[in-house]
Amino acid sequence: MKHATLLQPHRTAFTVRINDNGAWCWFQDERALIDPANNTLLVGSVAAPEGLGGAERGGNIEVAVLDLATGQSQVHVLHERLESDDHNAPALLIRPDGRYVAMYARHKTDNYSRWRVSVRPHDASEWEPEQVFDWTELAGGRGATYSNLHWLEAESRVYNFVRAINDDPTMLVSGDDGTTWSYGGKLFTRPKVGYVNGYTRYWGNGVDRIDLITTDHHPRDFNNSIYHGFIRGDALHDAEGQVVSKPLLGSTGINQDTLTTVFRAGTEIDGDILTHAWTADLRGQGNQLAAIISCRANDVNGPLQREQRLDVDDHRLLYARFDGTDWALHPLAVAGPGLLPHEQDYTGLGAVDPNNLDQVYISAPVHPGTGEATDHYEIYRGRTADGGASWSWTAVTENSGMDNLRPIVVPGDPSVHAVLWFRGSMSSSQAYTAEVVGRVSRLNESDRTAQTR
């Protein structure tokens, strides 16, 4: 079924609706990728019953494939009506043989990590039957959530990072490119506080290293700091390269505060006291990393009940840059009040350009360049020439009649610059009327050279 039309064709750029009913959370990756072998962009999302297609479509786990030459897209269903919840968005991977792997899980409401492999290379139109990894015995029947797929060539191994077993970051591993999976151990563990332990974002170089940033707990329940480490050679290291957990495979997990602190709760920047941090995005190039972190500014409440309102409802986005040795932390933008009344620490989020760490996209109800409040969340592009100390901003969307949320800058082909988001209205992670849209441009050689400077 086709759901997209080319809206604004140009010679080198276009804006497009890719899926007319979909949204995602931000703790799965890759949620979108470009396959240069067939000049397509793939993006996974979850349909909601409030959107087009109604209850018959609500809860579908979908992959939309955008033809970058024509601007037309096709939506393929991985699992019909699994569960209407944006946490269930699939993670995508291109195997060395060109076939796709998609993995997805429900939001703590059953005990399975699910996956499908495409029948043919570079073709998402047909998939092998769904398979499952059953966490019931390992997790005591308390559910599993999220999928994050990272292939390391040096190990001939794919990792899938899942939230399971005490709601800790855990691992599945595959030695056959995602055809079969086995339990790989835990990254972190600690006594549980509130809802969950360790919200983690990952970035892998595809060769021998996976970097990660993680929280203590959910920011509603705990005044989080943010920590950084990396996986290499069956060991977990801190930012300085010191081994903190080995062997990693089969590990029972360590306390994440053993890693290097990127953001310490209570940090003061420009007179604002910043607390209750959350991980938003992480990308890398060479030995450098860039991360976006959300946090509360000048909070007076501390831990919250689920329906409790913040007395000072003021969130910020921070930009953190790692030069291979040290982290530097900079203010990025005002993020506004909490996005949802019962999710007091939700923001519109932001994304780092995987091909240019000096470029970010954010969603905010305040123009980051002028400070002017807007009726809806808009998308802005930010660029820095000094490692994040200062920013220039351009509006990507303006005067919108609906919110524009959770941007992604799509990896896979440095010659294609694609930023995606979903737009519409959201009352909860389970109820939304939203469509997946994006802006795509093909960069010429001078553009690519400028990005790598």
Where are these regions (language model features)?
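Extracellular, repeat-based ectodomains that mediate carbohydrate processing or recognition
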Residues: 4-453
